Swiss-Prot record:
GO terms for molecular function: ATP binding; D-alanine [D-alanyl carrier protein] ligase activity. Keywords: ATP-binding, Cytoplasm, Ligase, Nucleotide-binding. D-alanine binds at D199, V303, K499. It comes from Streptococcus agalactiae serotype V (strain ATCC BAA-611 / 2603 V/R). This is D-alanine--D-alanyl carrier protein ligase. It is an enzyme of class 6 (ligase). It catalyses: holo-[D-alanyl-carrier protein] + D-alanine + ATP = D-alanyl-[D-alanyl-carrier protein] + AMP + diphosphate.
Length: 511
């Protein structure tokens, strides 16, 4: 168990100064270097006279300087707001408007003209590192102070800045490094692929820094180049893979992504979107001895609140994989529409309470009041997810409440439709999307389909292909759930965080 993230990092800087903490395409940085660089930058930040505990925006990609900047800001008592350098300009501007940062540290080239906020660019940061200014940590982020602020990808209105405190982070980190479901290896060698602006990144950097391990960063330029991506992954000595299931699906396109090529890769951690039986089965075939962990939780509850190592029995018997056993320190309940707790087996909204729950959205009391509340004397959060609890304490996922529609009198979970579509022998991946009429009632259901390789060659017309898919699914899908229109695509759009962009497709359909 750790009690202070900075003290833990400092401990490893003293006891294993020459051990690698960050490796980005062979450029290696040690724990000793991380201490020297973050000390020097923390001293400089202190000299700027910023408002105490004010948030600082950090702009960039997967560079080592990003990590060193985060550590420096934590030492100097400031929360950091990670913003990915591939973000849309409108999003960056919206974050600036909401967050009102006291400083911008730009590791990537900052694309906006800013008059009233000082900017440190990467050349200045590098020069500050070279100064090697010693620093005594006296006013680091602690307790309920904000450690980081992650902005959600909200598709409507202003993005919301989720405030995560040092206590929130400790609740998550101590659970992850001690939980038998994760079974994090000693000194973990972890893949660092999800961008820092996505809280899934905390699932790789927090346990790694807490246990003195090494992060292996994958820049976006590599991720976006399939050939380079597969060649790079095959050379990485990683033990632990942390990503969305969608990114694993992309890796599985390479036949070399297997235990023979990557014998040391023994752990897969998934969060951020639903892990399907199909993806987990493929991974089990490629990595028969690997531990595949399905985790679940919203950003507002600090990364994840439940996790389970997927068993062969689950792969054989489950239509939908369980999303885990909940954290001991975080009471998690399923409630009805009146807010009453439901018995095991009954479906309702998942709520989480306890020390992992955020204090709310930055500078947004209205949205905070809508989502955060007190439950049995503890801070709590409405996840907006449907779920149920088994008698064994396993949480089962029932889909998003906002992805639940009423069609021809039937209540339909879009994710259920998508799950069933994915069971067809012809389908590689699929999602279901509703089309609404002018009264905002569901007019029909559409299916976006990516076909398995070679399937299209077997059918002269899309109509014949659609008939074949429907025939394939007639015994497992109710008629009222079957989409009336099938749209075939080469791939499905992803959000910046690597999730299938269902809301974007819904917007496209309902223009």
């Amino acid at each position: 168990m750790i009690h202070d993230m900075i003290k833990t990092i400092e401990h490893f800087a003293e006891t294993q100064a020459d051990f690698p903490v960050y490796d980005i395409l062979g450029e290696v940085h040690t724990y000793g270097q991380l201490k020297v660089d973050s000390d020097s930058l923390a001293a400089h930040i202190d000299s700027l006279g910023l408002v105490e505990k004010s948030p600082v925006l950090v702009f960039g990609g997967q560079e080592y300087e990003m990590l060193a900047t985060f550590v420096a800001l934590t030492k100097s008592g400031h929360a950091y707001i990670p913003v990915d350098q591939h973000s849309a300009l409108d999003r960056i501007q919206a974050i600036m408007t909401v967050a009102q940062p006291s400083l911008i540290i730009s590791i990537g080239e900052f694309p906006l003209e800013v008059d009233n906020v000082p900017i440190l660019d990467v050349s200045q940061v590098s020069a500050i590192f070279e100064e090697k200014t010693p620093y005594e940590v006296t006013h680091s982020v602690k307790g309920d102070d904000n450690y980081y602020i992650i902005f959600t990808s909200g598709t409507t209105g202003l993005p919301k800045g989720v405030q995560i405190s040092h206590d929130n982070l400790l609740s998550f980190t101590n659970w992850m490094i001690s939980d038998d479901e994760f079974s994090v290896p000693e000194r973990p060698q972890m893949l660092a692929q999800p961008p820092y602006s996505f809280d899934l990144s905390v699932m790789y950097w927090a346990p790694t820094l807490a246990m003195g391990g090494t992060l292996f960063a994958l820049p976006k330029t590599v991720v976006n180049d399939f050939k380079k991506l597969f060649a790079t992954i095959n050379e990485l000595p990683i033990q632990v893979w942390t990503s969305t299931p969608s990114f694993a699906d992309m890796a599985l396109l390479s036949n070399d992504f297997n235990s023979e090529t990557l014998p040391q890769l023994t752990h897969f951690y998934f969060d951020g979107e639903e892990l399907t039986v199909k993806t987990a089965q493929k991974l089990r075939q490629r990595f028969p001895k690997a531990r595949i962990v399905n985790a679940y939780g919203p950003t507002e509850a600090t990364v994840a609140l439940s996790a389970v190592a997927i068993t062969d029995e689950m792969l054989e018997t489950c239509k939908r994989l369980p999303i885990g056993y909940t954290k001991d320190d975080s009471p998690t309940y399923v409630i009805d529409e009146e807010g009453h707790k439901l018995p095991n087996g009954e479906q309702g909204e998942i709520i989480i309470a306890g020390p992992a729950v955020s204090k709310g959205y930055l500078n947004n009391p209205e949205k905070t009041a809508e989502a955060f509340f007190q439950f049995e004397g503890l801070p709590a959060y409405h996840t907006g997810d449907l779920g149920s609890m088994t008698d064994e304490g396993l949480l089962l996922y029932g889909g998003r409440m906002d992805f639940q529609i009423k069609f021809n009198g039937y209540r339909i979970e879009l994710e259920d439709v998508s799950q069933n579509l994915n069971k067809s022998q012809y389908v590689k991946s699929a999602v279901a999307v509703p089309r609404y009429n002018k009264d905002h009632k569901v007019q029909n259901l559409l299916a976006y389909i990516v076909l398995k390789e070679g399937v299209r060659d077997d059918f002269e017309r899309d109509l014949d292909l659609t008939k074949a898919i429907k025939e394939d699914l007639k015994d497992i899908m109710m008629d009222y759930m079957m989409p009336s229109k099938f749209i075939y695509r080469e791939d499905l759009p992803l959000t910046p965080n690597g999730k299938i962009d269902i809301k974007g497709l819904m917007s496209e359909v309902n223009k």
